[in-house]
């Protein structure tokens, strides 16, 4: 197996070539990748089936197997997301601001690539493509280290992308994959400050915290999704039912699904039996606080641990609250700062929720399932940042750049 340092050196060297490419040259390379993926769908599915079979033998949950799965529809969606990124404006080289100083010099900021991005992710082979496409379009090299549960899928996708780059201006070395399943390789990777400019972990909260604790490389935290919907006493019941079902059961294994439901006490007796019936039609397990248990008598008592847990499964915990203030306090205590929603007709309550809830994305009368790069018009995302510095929310092209000061003069010297 190729030495880790050699791979990182090649990635670093490729960034100098990437920095000189224009938008058309980068888009042509992305188009070649999209075409090669589309041409090799059957081959990708065959390799993905190996991962699924091995996962079933290991006893992986349905939720994790769903994350690993690549079928024709999902692969065509990946191709479409590449086409969407091609259409997006290239942020590299954009002058963010320019001002003339009293001495005549022009001082501005220019968007430039970050450099080498390492993405460390669990069982989501689509991330292999999404991360690569966004990195290359924004002028960055990418180092991919996916989960061993999706290793065959990740390798075939990487090989197909590198093959596509062979006849383009983007060097193949700009895409590197770390195939070793050993955890020690991740720890070694995260010490490589000479070669890696930023690391982006994607996975469980425990996994992300582990990466942040051991890394010397700067890390952008992409949080787990312990997301809530709060139903205010004035909410439209039909709207609330539709949003809750979509946010919980459409794809429970993703980070923008909801895990908790908060309901105002004044509507709990009327609303809870209805929404619980809806949820149980999809075999969702109901857990609840003491007040919930008085209304939904066969619900499972929720523990303190439940309020912190991202289930990624057909499970939901319900809490009855006395007020919007209690709802906000509960959310800010237990959430992962990902996506939160309120269902209400009251503009002032909606505004209060928007201002006071600490999350990367806060919704009024809409499903949290929209927290996604494609849905936000970013084409795709390399991750959803839940921290407050550099980037917050879905990270697209702009978030994979930084700025440098550029200064134009006509011979000025400092007096």
UniProtKB/Swiss-Prot annotation:
NCBIfam families: PRK00197.1, proA. Catalyzes the NADPH-dependent reduction of L-glutamate 5-phosphate into L-glutamate 5-semialdehyde and phosphate. The product spontaneously undergoes cyclization to form 1-pyrroline-5-carboxylate. Keywords: Amino-acid biosynthesis, Cytoplasm, NADP, Oxidoreductase, Proline biosynthesis. It holds the Pfam family Aldedh. GO terms for molecular function: glutamate-5-semialdehyde dehydrogenase activity; NADP binding. Pathway: Amino-acid biosynthesis; L-proline biosynthesis; L-glutamate 5-semialdehyde from L-glutamate: step 2/2. It is found in: Cytoplasm. One of its GO terms (biological process) is L-proline biosynthetic process. PANTHER family: DELTA-1-PYRROLINE-5-CARBOXYLATE SYNTHASE, GLUTAMATE SEMIALDEHYDE DEHYDROGENASE. GO terms for cellular component: cytoplasm. SUPFAM superfamilies: ALDH-like. This is Gamma-glutamyl phosphate reductase. Its EC number is 1.2.1.41. Belongs to the gamma-glutamyl phosphate reductase family. It catalyses: L-glutamate 5-semialdehyde + phosphate + NADP(+) = L-glutamyl 5-phosphate + NADPH + H(+).
């Amino acid at each position: 197996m190729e030495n880790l340092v050699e791979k990182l050196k090649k990635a670093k060297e490729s960034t100098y070539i990437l920095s000189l490419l224009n938008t058309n040259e980068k888009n042509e390379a992305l188009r070649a990748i999209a075409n090669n993926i589309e041409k090799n769908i059957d081959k990708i599915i065959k390799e993905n089936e190996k991962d699924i079979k091995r996962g079933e033998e290991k006893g992986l949950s349905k939720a994790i197997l769903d994350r690993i799965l690549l079928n024709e529809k999902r692969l065509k969606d990946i191709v479409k997301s590449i086409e969407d990124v091609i259409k997006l404006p290239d942020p590299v080289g954009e002058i963010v601001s320019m001002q003339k100083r009293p001495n005549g010099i022009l001082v501005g900021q220019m968007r430039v690539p970050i450099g080498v991005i390492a993405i460390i992710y669990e069982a989501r082979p689509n991330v292999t493509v999404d991360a690569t496409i966004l990195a290359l379009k924004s002028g960055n090299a990418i180092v991919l280290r996916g989960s061993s549960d999706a290793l065959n899928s990740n390798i075939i996708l990487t090989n197909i992308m590198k093959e596509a780059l062979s006849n383009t201006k983007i060097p193949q070395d700009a895409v590197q994959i770390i195939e070793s399943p050993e955890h020690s390789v991740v720890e070694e990777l995260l010490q490589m400050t000479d070669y890696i400019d930023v690391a982006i972990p994607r996975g469980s909260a425990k996994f992300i915290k582990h990466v942040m604790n051991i890394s010397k490389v700067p890390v952008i935290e992409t949080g787990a999704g312990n997301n809530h919907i709060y139903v205010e006493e004035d909410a439209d019941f039909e709207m609330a039912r539709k949003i809750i079902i979509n946010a919980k059961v459409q794809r429970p294994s993703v980070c923008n699904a909801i895990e908790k439901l908060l309901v105002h006490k004044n509507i709990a007796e009327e609303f809870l039996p209805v929404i619980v019936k809806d949820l149980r039609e999809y075999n969702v397990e109901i857990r609840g606080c003491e007040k919930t248990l008085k209304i939904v008598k066969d619900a499972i008592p929720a523990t303190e641990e439940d309020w912190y847990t991202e289930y990624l499964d057909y499970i939901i915990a319900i809490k009855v609250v006395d007020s919007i203030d209690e709802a906000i306090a509960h959310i800010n205590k237990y959430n992962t700062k990902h996506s939160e929603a309120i269902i209400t007709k009251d503009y002032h309550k909606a505004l209060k929720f928007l201002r006071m809830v600490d999350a990367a994305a806060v919704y009024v009368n809409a499903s949290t399932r929209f927290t996604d790069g494609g849905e936000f018009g970013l084409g795709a995302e390399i991750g959803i940042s839940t921290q407050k510095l550099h980037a917050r929310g879905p990270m697209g092209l702009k978030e994979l750049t930084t700025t440098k000061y550029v200064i134009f003069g006509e011979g000025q010297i400092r007096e």
